[in-house]
Amino acid sequence: MGFRIYEIKARQIIDSRGNPTVEADVILEDGSLGRAAVPSGASTGINEAVELRDGDKSVYMGKGVLKAVENIINIISPELEGMSALNQVEIDRKMLALDGTPNKSKLGANAILAVSMATARAAAEYLGLKVYQYLGAYKANILPTPMCNIINGGAHSDNCVDFQEFMIMPIGAKTFNDAIRMSAEVFHTLKGILSKRGYATSVGDEGGFAPNLKSNEEACEVIMEAIKNAGYTPGTDIAIALDPATSELYDPETKKYVLRWSTKEELTSEEMVEYWAKWVEKYPIISIEDGMAEEDWDGWKKLTDKIGDKVQLVGDDLFVTNTSFLKKGIEMKVANAILIKVNQIGTLTETFEAVEMAKKAGYTAIVSHRSGETEDTTIADLVVALGTGQIKTGSLSRTDRIAKYNQLLRIEEELGSIAEYHGRDVFYSIKKQ
């Protein structure tokens, strides 16, 4: 009976931005250990599960997580001890019942998620399986097409670019290994282009460059140049993906989108939709995340009707990995994809439920990191287990991002001849161009 939980430990550690986060150890009766650390976001949806912070301004500027750690040790651990680590659903539902709030504000989503992920890791260790094998069983053989963040703007940097993330997707690669090589080559080529133009090549939270470009358009133009100079064809070998994070630009009082980092221009929902439609015609853009604000459901509907058959439209702040919001989106025919962030919802069980709902509705799903990350690689295993075929985990720099890519390279090697990389074919929610 060594598969039962013997003890749960927790501690406060540091994330990639130097802020505290929660790490948990789940120890089974046979000594099997599962360890997991949770991430945190910079731009967060208003409906996300609550990340419990201590609020003591004299310690870590109020961002300590000792209360969440105490909740694991004093509340969660005593209740889970003796339970089977092999029943992930039962473990997760027990924690949800202990919390008893709709947004996990009592125990903290950071406390609950750390234990949820660590439990899965402990169970995999007990069974002698890799985490992706344990969570995904025989279906776990699809490597994801990566969204590699190469230019940062908005809340992720200190420059004049309004939109948060400009990414590349190696849709023409044959393997994940090739996809990473192609992305790295474009990343290094872009660095040379920026340097020649006199721009800084320092990087933002997610490892992308944060140059003080003259306009939002210039970001796309230098990326196009980098793709070509690296020897690839834009739109065929490598496509562009965007996360403008427009909730950060939206003024709910005036219902306008304010391009506050660049021109100061104010756009209505209709004008924002036309803005994206023009960009999609001008650049090889295959995916736009949070193209409209989370509160602007009417704007989202207009955007989906306008370009939803051509481009993957990803709801992040809109859906916050929550089946209630996703159900609303499906019923309204809003967006055609969901971003999956485990810490937005707080348990692995709820994460699987969200992906299942998305797939049944014909929506694509992208497993994602957060801007505040750790060396934890759970999402790399998770994306293979879920078979979503897409991952968003930053640039080709910073160890907190590279850790996920390296884990996926290992997984592809382990899978050998049964490993699949679908490239452009992962975009089943849009018409093939």
Swiss-Prot record:
Q: Name where it mostly resides.
A: cytoplasm
List where in the cell it is found: Cytoplasm; Secreted; Cell surface
Identify the residues that bind Mg(2+): 243, 289, 316
- One function term, GO molecular function aspect: magnesium ion binding
List cofactor names only. Answer: Mg(2+)
Cell inner membrane as a keyword of this entry, yes or no, is: no
Q: In the Enzyme Commission scheme, what number(s) does this protein have?
A: 4.2.1.11
Report any one BP term from Gene Ontology.
glycolytic process
Top-rank taxon: Bacteria
Q: List residues binding (2R)-2-phosphoglycerate.
A: 164, 341, 370-371, 392
Q: Where does the record place a coiled coil?
A: none
User: What's noted on cofactor binding?
Assistant: Binds a second Mg(2+) ion via substrate during catalysis.
The record's listing under Pfam families reads: Enolase_C, Enolase_N
Q: Where are the transmembrane segments?
A: none
Give the metabolic or biological pathway: Carbohydrate degradation; glycolysis; pyruvate from D-glyceraldehyde 3-phosphate: step 4/5
- Gene Ontology cellular component annotations, sorted alphabetically: cell surface; extracellular region; phosphopyruvate hydratase complex
List the catalytic activities from the record: (2R)-2-phosphoglycerate = phosphoenolpyruvate + H2O
- Show the InterPro entries listed in the entry: Enolase, Enolase-like_C_sf, Enolase-like_N, Enolase_C, Enolase_CS, Enolase_N
Tell me its family: Belongs to the enolase family.
What exactly does this protein do?
Catalyzes the reversible conversion of 2-phosphoglycerate (2-PG) into phosphoenolpyruvate (PEP). It is essential for the degradation of carbohydrates via glycolysis.
What is the protein's given name? Enolase
Question: Gene name?
Answer: eno
